[in-house]
Amino acid sequence: MSSTQNIRIGVFVPTFNRPELLRSCVLQLLAQTRRPDIICVHQNGEGDNYAWCVADLHAPVVWMHTPARIPQNDWYRTPLNHLIQEDCTHFFWMDHDDIYLANHIETCIGELDIGYDFRISKHCGVLISRSPAFQYHPHARFDDIHATGGMSASMAFTLPFARALSTDLGNPEFNHVFADEVLARHTMPRFRCLHSTQKTTVYLSHASSLSSAHWVREDTTFHEFRSDA
């Protein structure tokens, strides 16, 4: 598929209890060199609906609010299905608490359009945010941290992959702890996948992070990562 014709870009962003991070994520999407056509935000969990945090941005946001906790895989599958129904051709899996450089979407589409169904990058920056200080590591590699073999929030894929992923996420036999494990173990092996060397993302570790809050509490030297150098 040509990168300039018949493209409809859909982004799904799960969010929980962090309206300030979600607003930042949507602002980053609006700053992309290739803006998405639809941003499907899924607020999952207890608490008040915070759609107000992006209401003034005039962004193409579809807001879904699930007032009670649901299975982890449905947190991703629900907005993914909406984007499929909206006839999207290119899909982006984004987390509300990561940083996306302005060329992220454009870079991913360029890589998918050379013949891949799925792309992910193991190269990224890492920001450890601890008040009142922070650590920034511009060169890190996600080799074994995530099941996908890269930074999960850097994933992008085509419609055939999206349909297969939706089916896999809805399979009760694939009851892994995290949705990206389902993707890595069951969906990726059936498609043409690219492990990109492009760095268009920064992974954010903060006190509320489910997967990396321990970095905030530790005096880390990033033994979990390999340097690009």
Model-derived features: positions:
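N-proximal low-complexity "stem/linker" segments adjacent to membrane-targeting elements
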Residues: M1-L27
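A conserved acidic beta->alpha catalytic loop
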Residues: H42-W52, A68
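Glycine-rich, basic loop-to-helix element that forms the pyrophosphate-binding segment
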Residues: P67-L83
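Short beta-strand-to-loop acidic/aromatic patch adjacent to the donor-nucleotide binding site
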Residues: C88-D97
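Acidic donor-binding/catalytic loop of UDP-sugar-dependent glycosyltransferases
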Residues: D98-E111
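Acidic donor-binding loop at a coil-to-helix junction in glycosyltransferase catalytic cores
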Residues: F174-L183
